[in-house]
Amino acid sequence: MKKITFLSALIAIPMAMSAQSQIYPQHFDLQNVRLLDGPFRKAMVTNDHHLLKYDADRLMTPLIRQAGLNEKEGSRYYGWVEKHPSFPNWGQKDWSLEGHIGGHYLTALALAYAATDDASMKKQLKERLDYCLNIVKDCQDAYAADTKGLRGFVGGQPINQIWTGLYADNLTEFRKYGHWVPFYCEHKILAGLRDAWLYAGSKVARECFKNICDWSVLVVSNLSDSDMQAILGFEHGGMNETLVDAYTIFGDKRYLDAAKKYSHQYMVKGMQGEGTYSKTFLNGKHANTQVPKYIGFQRIAQEDASASDYKAAAHNFWEDVANNRTVCIGGNSVNEHFLSQDNCEKYITAPDGPESCNTNNMLKLSEMLFDSSHDARYADFYEYAMWNHILSTQDPKTGGYVYFTSLQPQAYRIYSQPNEGMWCCVGTGMENHSKYAHFIYTHDGKQTLYVNLFTASTLKDKNFALTQQTNFPYEQATKIIVDKAGAYTIAIRHPRWVTEGYSVTINGEKQSVSVERGRASYVTLNRKWRKGDVIQVSLPMELRMEECPNYTDYVAFEYGPMLLGAQTTAMDKNDEKVTGLPYESLRNEYGDDSRMGHSYGVRGRTLSLSSAPLLLCDRSKVMQRISVSDPDRLQFKIKVDANTGSTEKVYPWTTLTLRPFYEIQHARYMCYWYQRPQEVFAQSDMTRADREARAINDRTVDFVATGEQQSEAGHKADYSTDSRYGAYRDEFYRDCQKGGHVEYTLVNTTGKSEDLSLMLRYTTADKGRVATISIDDEPLQVITIPAKAENTDGKGFFNMTLPLPAKMLTEKNGKGVKKEIRVRMTATGDTPMPGCYYVRLLKK
């Protein structure tokens, strides 16, 4: 990293103490809560070191380039881009999210700085943060004299014309580049600057944050309400949330008004109704596009008591996602989208499961809703998702992050590497592991201290101080030592999962508590506390079985708040000797800069469902198969069945070890298990479906999930203005009107021009619709959707395979094989183009 010295590099943080409390008035400043030894502290320390491995110069390059500083002779940044090239992957020329990781990095450094008690690490993190912030300031200053809508701006996407267009009330460029999600990227910069002020006390960050908030107001100031709502149909992160925060910090009502302007009213209105909200409204929607919107809605409701519709929307959204769409790891969605109740088999059959960003944001929303209600259900949800999803997404060896956590039996994780693969979940991953102390304790002022999480830690605040000693969940108890005398209430969570025997003692004296098993609540202890008082809380747990939401063929096992998983392969050769499990070198276990380098479904080696361990018995007898193995390590033995009739090689398991899911890394795992009687399994179509799906997947060279934002953007999607996307019978499609077109670029990695074909997925519901399929502007075939088709599935979908002539895959000079082909579908008949549900390039 190039050394640049700035006068403002050493700024103390006293003002941040009150700044955090401005935004989070019921939370303790992060630097006042310290993690003690345990899984969370270990993850935090690992992450601190991992953050410093990132090349800050390259993370800042997009901002420098867009500000024009790279080309300014005499500037310290002259020639910067050539020396420090921007990261690829999501900084591709055809789909750039440049700048988003830079924003996350500011947040991550600030959080890590506040959370650590290591003086040397704190110094390094602060120096790195100040270094980046002063670059951001220089970039922002470069726009100071601008009069075309860029004053106060700082950003990394190579599309400044979007912003000048919006300011001029011209949406042409935004419509062209909206799928690059420009406001999503800008939100990360806003949030990073906000957090650098809140958690690290940087006055530079505070000034830059105010300026970019002013820009956020300015750039859309000339848009009509209808045009504003149109652009909010594209992913825009939590723009509304950060603007509410600006209102809280600076007291300028313009920011609160702007937050409402940045609020997608379709999503507000779609989740109204106390207990009567639509349970289908979220079906098919891109999940993490939505969660930050509702965080912003809740922030608006916190600052504006009259915003009851925003409050209802946030509450109902959480209820729907937490109660109807959350799976065994505490996450939600498949391949980034919410499923319908009729399509929940995809939790198991789809290889790319819950996205880490979703859970990161659901935890934020849970905190906010808890602050407004002190409802213990939010804390229960937080605990479960934190242990089973967030903690499990860190590679304990390298500190790398995980994008999708597959729920498929025998899946494995794909980890990021520093300075490679700038995925969105790398950004939130950077932040996650410095926030474990954020919600352990909260308060309502000076009267009540809430103990929300059972995490070994200390709290030292002007009003409260205590130490929590525990090895939870490996110990079914926690001890709380009061370190500051005073008259106040301590409220301790009674979790939903706790069994009979929950008890609380103070200095050895048992307290009378009123709790209901299976219902989350708080036990309140009101007294005049003396320094040294000891509270003991007993937290008995039991093993239980939970069904997969709306797909009851599969079950998971939980102990207390912990999901129990099982390895089916060894982590390494030594683990093979210890466990007796076979060792497998996992394909592409570490992601790269390829477009889908984060995807287990694309980059990993998937196995068939029928080759996984099974539980073939009556459901009433499942728990009889499980016995305690090592209670101190939460380990159990489970008797399993191996499907010897599988078309794939099946390891002859008889027993496997259940243990906390987050511990299982660098190996294939089970979290959901097929559980039906032998006779039901024998009549199921699992093996046939496995065989058919595997045959297609093994032949797939490239794949476009049409109608899905990231897949389309990653394949240089180009379509006419009348094109639309949607979902039919739980599958996504894209079509266009008469005369319109849809085009994608597919990559041919085979190096061959022969024996390749195109597979297109359609539905007979579009019978009579006509399209011309072209390759690089050369017609391949005119297709008409029939009323009936061979191999139509039960929902009316079928696959159409079109062989590709070798000449279409050969360069025009005849001397090489094309590495890319443009597949265009044109509505050449008198009807709209038939909806296309995916495009595959297949090898023989």
Where is each model-derived feature located?
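Beta-strand-rich binding/interaction modules
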Residues: 487-506, 756-758
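C-terminal beta-rich recognition modules with glycine/proline-rich loops and embedded aromatic residues
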Residues: 314, 380-388, 393, 399-482, ...
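Solenoidal tandem-repeat scaffolds enriched in leucines and small polar residues
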Residues: 213, 218-220, 226, 230-268, ...
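Beta-strand-rich ligand-recognition modules
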Residues: 510-532, 538-552, 724-753, 761-843
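Asp-box/WD-like beta-propeller blade repeats and closely related beta-sheet repeat scaffolds
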Residues: 159-180, 206, 212-230
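Bacterial Sec-dependent N-terminal signal peptides
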Residues: 1-21
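Aromatic (Trp/Tyr) and acidic
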Residues: 20-119, 123, 127, 161-199, ...
